[in-house]
Amino acid sequence: MNSLEAGRVLSVLDEALEGIRLISYVTQDVLDTAEQLRDMLGEDLANALIKHRQLIQSAKSTLNNDQVQASTLELVRLLKKSPSAQRLQVLPYERTYGILQTLQYFEQLRQFAQKRLTTTVEEDSSNREFFEEVRDREERAVAEQEQLKQKLKLQRVELQKAAGTIQVSEDRARGEVSEVQSSTQQSRAAIEGSARAQSEADKSSFQSDLDQVTKELAAARAELARLRQEHKDNEALLRKARKRAEQDVEVQIGEYDADVGAKEEELGKARAEYEEVLRQLQEYNSGWSEMYQERLEYEERERRLADQRFQAALLAVRQNHAARVIQSYWRGFKKAREAAKKKAKKLEKAKAAKKK
């Protein structure tokens, strides 16, 4: 066979190999989704896939493969001709193991044919000598394998004897395990009975504790409602006191404005007293804000059952402290107002004396 004929044979094999490679991408998943791949593969190729799928389904019931073979050849022809056939390679479908094996065998066949067609007489003779040498090696290897098999049989007999000894030990161990399991079951039954009795006792104790805690919770809620109402009343009183204090401050400011023509020293003293009153008012406002914030924090902490009594006592202490602060401030404020009235009377007497 000359090189031209060899090239033709290889060309035919390459064409067949390309057809097998293209048809390997036509998996069952591709056939099932042929309608969805119409835009990707084109109308003709999608219709061919749908027709091929229908023929395969009908061939399962009729056992007629002629139409399937003809459809396969037509599908291979379209795959070779269509430029969109390469897009099948990017689909997330795996090819079957059988088609991959066929493709591999056909590639090996093509390589073997190419090697045979391009091999000279000398190379063929050399290959035959190499084949004879390999065959001799294989025969020697087979003989060695038979010897090893005989040795393996002897070893198996020895292992079977050892296995019999091991089986006796295993039976003895199983008997001991059975005794341990029996004693374990008895211990388990005793432990379960004890645990069940302890569980009943714990349930009874828990119910008693739950009733006690429920009563304490109801009492704490009633105390919280009372404290809230008391705090609300105190807050109303504080607002009234603040309003009265503001009115008194306005009166004092008017009196100070009327005495602008007085001496500079008296004016400075009046301003100092006025600033002191404002500072006390700011302290009062700050104390009121702190009391309000503490009340919010108290209500939040009251939701915790473990701190109910402690929080109620703490709030009572804070309210008593606030009342003492307010009373102290009010006594100081009354003293300041009485002092201001006395000073105003002195100023009036001084003015009357000057007029005389």
Swiss-Prot record:
An example Gene Ontology CC term for this record: motile cilium
InterPro entries referenced in this protein's UniProt entry, alphabetically: DRC10 (IPR042815)
Keywords: Cell projection, Cilium, Coiled coil, Cytoplasm, Cytoskeleton, Flagellum
UniProt biased composition (Low complexity): 178-187
Subcellular compartments: Cytoplasm, Cytoskeleton, Flagellum axoneme
Region: Disordered, residue numbers: 173-209
Annotated ranges, domain IQ: 319-348
Subunit field text: Component of the nexin-dynein regulatory complex (N-DRC).
Task performed by this protein: Component of the nexin-dynein regulatory complex (N-DRC), a key regulator of ciliary/flagellar motility which maintains the alignment and integrity of the distal axoneme and regulates microtubule sliding in motile axonemes.
Protein name in UniProt: Dynein regulatory complex protein 10
Organism for this UniProt entry: Chlamydomonas reinhardtii (Chlamydomonas smithii)
Organism taxonomic ancestry: Eukaryota, Viridiplantae, Chlorophyta, core chlorophytes, Chlorophyceae
